[in-house]
Amino acid sequence: MANSKSAKKRAIQAEKRRQHNASRRSMMRTYMKKTIAAIEAGNKEAATAALVEVTPLLDRMATKGLIHKNKAARHKSRFAAAIKAL
Protein backbone atom coordinates (compact mmCIF):
# COMPACT_ATOMS: atom_id res chain seq x y z
CA MET A 1 0.00 0.00 0.00
CA ALA A 2 1.10 3.57 -0.61
CA ASN A 3 2.93 5.20 2.29
CA SER A 4 3.48 8.79 1.21
CA LYS A 5 0.77 11.32 0.46
CA SER A 6 1.83 11.59 -3.20
CA ALA A 7 1.85 7.80 -3.62
CA LYS A 8 -1.68 7.60 -2.20
CA LYS A 9 -2.81 10.30 -4.62
CA ARG A 10 -1.21 8.48 -7.56
CA ALA A 11 -2.91 5.22 -6.52
CA ILE A 12 -6.29 6.98 -6.45
CA GLN A 13 -5.64 8.58 -9.85
CA ALA A 14 -4.52 5.26 -11.34
CA GLU A 15 -7.68 3.50 -10.13
CA LYS A 16 -9.87 6.30 -11.51
CA ARG A 17 -8.07 6.10 -14.87
CA ARG A 18 -8.36 2.29 -14.91
CA GLN A 19 -12.13 2.46 -14.44
CA HIS A 20 -12.49 5.17 -17.10
CA ASN A 21 -10.41 3.17 -19.58
CA ALA A 22 -12.40 0.01 -18.82
CA SER A 23 -15.60 1.87 -19.66
CA ARG A 24 -14.17 3.16 -22.94
CA ARG A 25 -12.79 -0.26 -23.86
CA SER A 26 -16.19 -1.84 -23.20
CA MET A 27 -17.93 0.75 -25.39
CA MET A 28 -15.40 0.16 -28.18
CA ARG A 29 -15.92 -3.62 -28.03
CA THR A 30 -19.71 -3.18 -28.11
CA TYR A 31 -19.54 -1.13 -31.31
CA MET A 32 -17.12 -3.65 -32.84
CA LYS A 33 -19.49 -6.52 -31.97
CA LYS A 34 -22.36 -4.65 -33.66
CA THR A 35 -20.26 -4.33 -36.81
CA ILE A 36 -19.24 -8.00 -36.73
CA ALA A 37 -22.87 -9.09 -36.19
CA ALA A 38 -24.03 -7.02 -39.18
CA ILE A 39 -21.28 -8.50 -41.37
CA GLU A 40 -22.09 -12.08 -40.29
CA ALA A 41 -25.79 -11.46 -40.95
CA GLY A 42 -24.88 -10.47 -44.51
CA ASN A 43 -26.69 -7.15 -44.23
CA LYS A 44 -24.52 -4.77 -46.25
CA GLU A 45 -26.51 -1.62 -45.39
CA ALA A 46 -26.43 -2.29 -41.64
CA ALA A 47 -22.76 -3.28 -41.81
CA THR A 48 -21.87 -0.08 -43.66
CA ALA A 49 -23.80 1.99 -41.12
CA ALA A 50 -22.03 0.18 -38.27
CA LEU A 51 -18.66 0.80 -39.93
CA VAL A 52 -19.44 4.52 -40.17
CA GLU A 53 -20.11 4.49 -36.40
CA VAL A 54 -17.11 2.42 -35.36
CA THR A 55 -14.44 4.10 -37.54
CA PRO A 56 -14.25 7.45 -35.71
CA LEU A 57 -14.56 5.61 -32.39
CA LEU A 58 -11.50 3.47 -33.16
CA ASP A 59 -9.58 6.57 -34.27
CA ARG A 60 -10.52 8.36 -31.05
CA MET A 61 -9.44 5.43 -28.87
CA ALA A 62 -6.12 5.28 -30.73
CA THR A 63 -5.61 9.02 -30.23
CA LYS A 64 -6.39 8.71 -26.50
CA GLY A 65 -3.85 5.88 -26.21
CA LEU A 66 -6.36 3.19 -25.31
CA ILE A 67 -5.30 1.08 -28.30
CA HIS A 68 -2.36 1.36 -30.70
CA LYS A 69 -2.98 3.27 -33.92
CA ASN A 70 -2.00 0.21 -35.97
CA LYS A 71 -4.62 -1.87 -34.16
CA ALA A 72 -7.26 0.71 -35.04
CA ALA A 73 -6.10 0.70 -38.67
CA ARG A 74 -6.11 -3.11 -38.77
CA HIS A 75 -9.69 -3.35 -37.49
CA LYS A 76 -10.96 -0.65 -39.85
CA SER A 77 -9.25 -2.33 -42.80
CA ARG A 78 -10.61 -5.79 -41.98
CA PHE A 79 -14.13 -4.48 -41.44
CA ALA A 80 -14.04 -2.59 -44.74
CA ALA A 81 -12.71 -5.63 -46.61
CA ALA A 82 -15.39 -7.89 -45.09
CA ILE A 83 -18.15 -5.43 -46.03
CA LYS A 84 -16.79 -5.08 -49.55
CA ALA A 85 -16.89 -8.88 -49.93
CA LEU A 86 -20.62 -8.99 -49.07
Curated annotation (Swiss-Prot):
Domain of life of the native organism: Bacteria
Keywords, in A-Z order: Ribonucleoprotein, Ribosomal protein, RNA-binding, rRNA-binding
InterPro entries in UniProt: Ribosomal_bS20, Ribosomal_bS20_sf
GO MF annotations, alphabetized: small ribosomal subunit rRNA binding; structural constituent of ribosome
Any one GO BP annotation for this protein: translation
Tagged with keyword rRNA-binding: yes
One Gene Ontology cellular component: small ribosomal subunit
Keyword presence, Ribonucleoprotein: yes
Pfam families xref list: Ribosomal_S20p
SUPFAM superfamilies linked: Ribosomal protein S20
Region feature Disordered, mapped onto this chain: 1-27
Protein task: Binds directly to 16S ribosomal RNA.
Family designation: Belongs to the bacterial ribosomal protein bS20 family.
Protein name per UniProt: Small ribosomal subunit protein bS20
